Amino acid sequence: MAETYSTLAALFTDIADAIREKTGATATIVADDFPDVIRNVLQVKTYLTFSSPSSFTLKVNDTTKHWDGILEYSTDTSTWSTWDGTTTLSSATSRSDNVLYLRGTGNTVITGNGNKDSYKWVLTGSNITCIGNIENLLDYATVESGNHPTMADYCYYYMFYGCTGLTQAPALPATTLTTYCYSNMFYGCTALTHAPALPATTLATSCYQNMFRGCTSLTQAPALPATTLAPGCYT
């Protein structure tokens, strides 16, 4: 049954909480700003946003590029630089937060089939949210056009393994999955409090294997709408 509200204030408070949960923001939303805030939330973002109240860094565990196209990073969404995977990226201050933005072009895989967690990404910091559509790392122009980029096997394999400072996961909107694509993706993310929605209806071998293993702060599992399963998909 849909929730009812006794006052408009209660309704707007709930809407504000939902917006903050979606965007990762913490500031109070005043009534006059509601229309613009909602419009901004509804706009398609063509990048992935990492955000924290404190400074943080991001690197590839073995300082090697494993994506098969281009990844770019920015701290202001205006100036973008190519990331070759060999350097450590640092956040920059934006208002009350520290932020780092990433987007990709022509990628079908981000981490790939390494030796377990050898190709993982390492986030060093605390209270880090990852906001936006993960597919922006594959090809942001495809996402902007309303489509899903092609995803290869082992696409996000072990990507955030052991990232204990990650508190919010990105959206995972793909509806057709590939072998081991999300396997071990959030393994050991002990600060993760909510699992992202998993809308996929076409599964693949071991696609979700150990995806949330060791996520000790999760209290509720996501809905699993697929009606036809694949070998090891939920192991």
Predicted ranges, named:
Residues 1-49:
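Surface-exposed receptor/substrate recognition regions of extracellular proteins
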Residues 56-58, 91-108:
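Noncatalytic modules at the cell exterior or secretory-pathway interfaces
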Residues 48-51, 84-92, 102, 110-112, ...:
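Structural signature of tandem-repeat unit edges
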Residues 16, 66-70:
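Exposed beta-strand and adjacent loop surfaces of beta-rich binding modules
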Residues 70-76:
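Conserved Ser/Thr-centered positions that define the repeating blades of beta-propeller domains
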Residues 42-66, 136-140:
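Extracellular ectodomain segments of secreted/surface proteins
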Residues 76-85:
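Surface-exposed loop/edge segments in extracytoplasmic proteins
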